[in-house]
Amino acid sequence: MKVSVLITLAVLGVMFLLTSAEERGSDQMDSPAWLKSMEIIFQSEERECRWLFGGCEKDSDCCEHLGCRRAKPSWCGWDFTVGKWEMLINMNIFRIVFSYSMCTV
C-alpha cells in the first residue's frame, strides 16, 4: 500500500514538472511582441479598404458590401448586398419585377 502511494506521488511530481515546463514555453508564444509580429503578417495579406462612412473616390476603395456614395463629401455606404447569393436573388427579383412592369404598361 505504501509503495503504491509513493509511486502515485512520484508520477504526480513528474507530471507537475512536465506541465510547468510546458507553461513556461507557452509564455513566449503569448508575449505581446509575438502577437504584434503575427498582426503585421495578417495585415500585409489584407487589402486596405474603407469602412462604413469612410471617405472614398470609387467603389473599390470601400470594403466588401459597401459602395462609394457620390454625395459631397463622398462616403462608403451599404450597397444592399449580403453575399453572392443575395446579389443573385436581388438581380432575379429585379428581372421579375421589371418584366412584370413591362407587361402591365
Swiss-Prot record:
Residues recorded with modification Valine amide: V82
Assigned keywords, A-Z: Amidation, Disulfide bond, Ion channel impairing toxin, Knottin, Secreted, Signal, Toxin
Tissue: Expressed by the venom gland.
GO CC annotations, alphabetized: extracellular region
Disulfide partners: C49-C63, C56-C68, C62-C76
GO MF term list: ion channel inhibitor activity; toxin activity
Signal sequence region: 1-21
Propeptide: 22-48, 83-105
Superkingdom of the organism of origin: Eukaryota
Localization in the cell: Secreted
Pfam families noted in UniProt: Toxin_12 (PF07740)
Function: Probable ion channel inhibitor.
Membership in a protein family: Belongs to the neurotoxin 10 (Hwtx-1) family. 05 (F4a) subfamily.
The record's note on its domains: The presence of a 'disulfide through disulfide knot' structurally defines this protein as a knottin.
The protein's name in its UniProt record: U21-theraphotoxin-Cg1a 4
Naturally occurring in which organism (per UniProt): Chilobrachys guangxiensis (Chinese earth tiger tarantula)
